């Protein structure tokens, strides 16, 4: 999923000061690992944050302060002003009153330095990271299916250093902890599925700005590593013609869409979320090679502790168990090490391919009977034929106060291929999870805590749609929609 607006409705950039760090109500942590020491009782500790300063971003409702990076030596904040193709630099020398120091037009810089022929061919800025002397910015092309760029700026002078051309839709980037490389998640998101660019992880060596690419072609059908791709990795993209008619299935390399990445402390390994594919790729950075791909599996919302609210039209908080499965589909991820074991943390946001053209072989008709050349991925439960053996109470389940309004994937769930749905799969886990980075085993999931805690604090304003300020407005989609860590 392309980066979304993470700024507030006022389009402002806010600084916060963490006053105390801890986990509320944790109790004793016990023993960590085989040789770990006893944990510290954290029952009385809380997290408390207080806003220290605030400044208006450069544009209202335009993703104008979407991603930020702090440069400590100069006390500057680099903010991605996404749709304008700008980087806004704010001085935080006085953190109580940050001020705009400079806006850098990346489109003009790319043209002036011979990296692009016209500003119209340069799209949005998607990500920024800072390390040492450099700020690196991911910039997509226009259209986004073209090759994008990583622009390097000097953090002291804010001058252009160079730009490296990368794959289609560089969605997120970060420096390795040692600062030797910039690693870029190349999402390769299609515009309308007439073209589906390949996803990849692009690796730039900072010393000489050389580029290596870790791609996924070996996992294609017939590829040398096709057998290594777990069966539960979701691969279902399709190439269509200009009329939206099915031409062929996308390859694995075309279908995977690297979303976000985290780097191990030793700067040797990248962990990359493949959001739409419900998977994580592990990348050997030294050799620019995909080491393995983990399928993340599914969350059983029938189980105690995995409750969710599924309707935006029931005028109430109704966090309960329902006969659906959640696809974790993380956006941002992080990594850390405890007692020699590496772990991955995921924010299980979820994402569908509802806004891109997906036709079906032999014709395009949705389950409600309407002609359809777009959106063969996301449907509401009320519009799907449910298997009467799997759902004996299908008629009541499809009412709007129950599962009827819930958005699910039509690309999976017909387990016996008889044209109706035996299982229902929703987008996202409405949670965060911790995974063993070596095995891909899930060792923790926060279950229904996000919805329970926000409902307790905000009442029916939980699962709010920030665009419309609509209470309970996201319960039919991805609920609290955790995106960042």
Where are each of the predicted segments found?
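Initiator methionine at the very start of the polypeptide chain
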Residues: 1-2, 337
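Bacterial N-terminal signal peptides that target proteins for export
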Residues: 2-14
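C-terminal motif of bacterial Sec signal peptides marking the signal peptidase cleavage site
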Residues: 22-25
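Beta-sheet-rich non-transmembrane sensory/scaffold domains
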Residues: 27, 43-484
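Collagen/collagen-like triple-helix recognition
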Residues: 27-42
């Amino acid at each position: 999923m392309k980066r979304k607006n993470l700024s507030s409705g006022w389009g402002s950039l806010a600084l916060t000061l963490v006053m105390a760090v801890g986990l509320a109500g944790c109790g004793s942590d016990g023993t960590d690992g085989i040789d770990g020491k006893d944990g510290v009782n954290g029952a009385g500790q809380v997290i408390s944050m207080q806003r220290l300063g605030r400044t208006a971003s450069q544009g209202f409702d335009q993703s104008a302060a979407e991603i930020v990076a702090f440069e400590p030596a100069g006390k500057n904040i680099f903010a991605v002003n996404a749709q304008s193709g700008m980087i806004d630099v704010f001085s935080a020398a006085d953190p109580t009153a940050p001020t705009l120091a400079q806006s850098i037009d990346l489109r003009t810089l790319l043209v002036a330095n011979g990296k692009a022929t016209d500003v119209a061919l340069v799209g949005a800025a998607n990500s920024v990271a800072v390390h040492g002397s450099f700020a690196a910015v991911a910039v997509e092309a226009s259209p986004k299916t073209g090759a994008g760029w990583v622009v390097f700026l000097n953090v002291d002078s804010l001058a252009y250093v160079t730009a490296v051309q990368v794959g289609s839709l560089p969605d997120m980037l970060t420096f390795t902890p040692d600062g030797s490389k910039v690693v870029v998640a190349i999402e390769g998101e299609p515009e309308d599925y007439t073209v589906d660019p390949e996803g990849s992880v692009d690796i730039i060596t900072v010393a000489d700005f050389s580029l290596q690419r870790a791609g996924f072609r070996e996992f294609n059908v017939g590829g040398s590593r096709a057998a290594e791709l777990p069966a539960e990795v979701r691969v279902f993209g399709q190439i269509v013609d200009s009329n939206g008619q099915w031409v062929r299935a996308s390859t694995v390399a075309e279908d995977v869409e690297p979303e976000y990445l985290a780097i191990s402390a030793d700067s040797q390994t990248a962990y990359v979320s493949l959001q739409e594919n419900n998977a994580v790729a592990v990348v050997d950075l030294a050799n620019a090679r995909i080491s393995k791909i983990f399928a993340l599996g599914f969350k059983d919302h029938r189980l105690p502790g995995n409750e969710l609210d599924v309707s935006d039209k029931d005028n109430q908080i109704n966090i309960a168990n329902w006969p659906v499965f959640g696809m974790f589909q993380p956006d941002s991820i992080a990594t850390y090490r405890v007692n020699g074991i590496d772990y991955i943390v995921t924010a299980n946001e979820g994402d569908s391919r509802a806004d891109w053209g997906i036709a079906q072989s032999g014709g395009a008709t949705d389950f409600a009977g309407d002609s359809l050349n777009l959106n063969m991925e996301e449907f509401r439960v009320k519009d799907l034929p449910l298997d009467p053996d799997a759902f004996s109470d299908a008629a009541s389940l499809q009412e709007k106060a129950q599962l009827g309004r819930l958005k699910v994937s039509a690309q999976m769930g017909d387990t016996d291929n008889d044209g109706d749905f035996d299982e229902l799969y929703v987008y996202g886990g409405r949670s965060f999870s911790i995974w063993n980075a070596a095995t891909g085993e899930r060792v923790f999931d926060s279950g229904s805590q996000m919805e329970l805690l926000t409902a307790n604090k905000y009442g029916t304003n939980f699962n709010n749609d920030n665009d419309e300020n609509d209470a309970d407005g996201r319960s039919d989609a991805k609920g609290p929609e955790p995106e960042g860590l």
